[in-house]
Amino acid sequence: MNTPAVRFAARTVRVKAPGKINVSLDVGPRRPDGYHSVASVYLAVSLYEEVAATSTETPGITVSLSPDSTLDLDAVDIPLDASNLAYRAAAIMADVSEHATGVHLEITKRVPVAGGMGGGSADAAATLLACDALWNSGLSREELAHLAAELGADVPFSLLGGTAVGLGVGDQLSPALAKAKTHWVLVTADFGLSTPEVFRTLDRLREAEGVDADEPTGVDPNILAALRGGDADALSRILVNDLQRASIELAPSLRDTLGIGESHGAIAGIVSGSGPTVALLADDSVAAEALAEDLQHQGLSALAVHGPVPGARIISDTLL
């Protein structure tokens, strides 16, 4: 008697993970290993990447970009091979999962590419969580965070979300109990900046000025207090990003963007991380929406967001 073949049941787990802005970023000197120690306050904001992980009968990992992406996919260079962070995240999960199958990853891109907001890191965090669920790996959040750190400094934060202090190269995270909302307008650029190049430029500027940077040991407690209280006015006076001048050196138009934002009602502005995304702080949600609309009329790509928001989370789990 023939045993009926077992039909493969495909399943899709969809996860969303937030982009981030650096509310503060202190950068130490270049270390012998080429990296820089940092002290940063990360804020997860309401601009999300989505990854749909679908099990496949065919072994291996494939990646595609969703037509629902809000980015112009023709204008950005996103690898779909093993160099993609989401691909690498799936490969790491396959190595530690007893029931791994083939998987197809469809990524919905909304966070600017090479924009200083950790879009690729959000893809990786979403993929870790999606594959953990898809393959019933049963890893704890702590175990997932350990794998996330192997992929890049920003990946653990996208998994965690909320507000956090990052030390080391940004991967040593301590959650900050700052849940009050702040409102921002993100002005995105039609170009990217290479994070290593921005750090090299900062080193060059410091060397030319004879500046010996100190190793950062912590963040300004006033920033955390302002975030805990949702005090935009206090926060506006203490935003800091050591990389900002290097980003402006490479892309002088960022100085104009900051100026235009503040002239149209932003109470402060900062380049996020290595840029080129500019984060403009607004008094409240109404002011943020009005500012975004004004900047759009100026021909800029601007959208209102808020933070903090939760980290990567499953939004659907479907048998096909």
Swiss-Prot record:
Q: Keywords of this protein's UniProt record, alphabetized?
A: ATP-binding, Isoprene biosynthesis, Kinase, Nucleotide-binding, Transferase
The record, for InterPro entries, names: GHMP_kinase_C_dom (IPR013750), GHMP_kinase_C_sf (IPR036554), GHMP_kinase_N_dom (IPR006204), IspE (IPR004424), Ribosomal_Su5_D2-typ_SF (IPR020568), Ribsml_uS5_D2-typ_fold_subgr (IPR014721)
Give the enzyme class.
Answer: transferase
Q: Does the keyword Transmembrane apply?
A: no
Pathway connected to this protein: Isoprenoid biosynthesis; isopentenyl diphosphate biosynthesis via DXP pathway; isopentenyl diphosphate from 1-deoxy-D-xylulose 5-phosphate: step 3/6
Catalytic center at which residues? K20, D154
GO-annotated biological processes? isopentenyl diphosphate biosynthetic process, methylerythritol 4-phosphate pathway; terpenoid biosynthetic process
Q: Which HAMAP family match?
A: IspE (MF_00061)
| Protein name per its UniProtKB record | 4-diphosphocytidyl-2-C-methyl-D-erythritol kinase
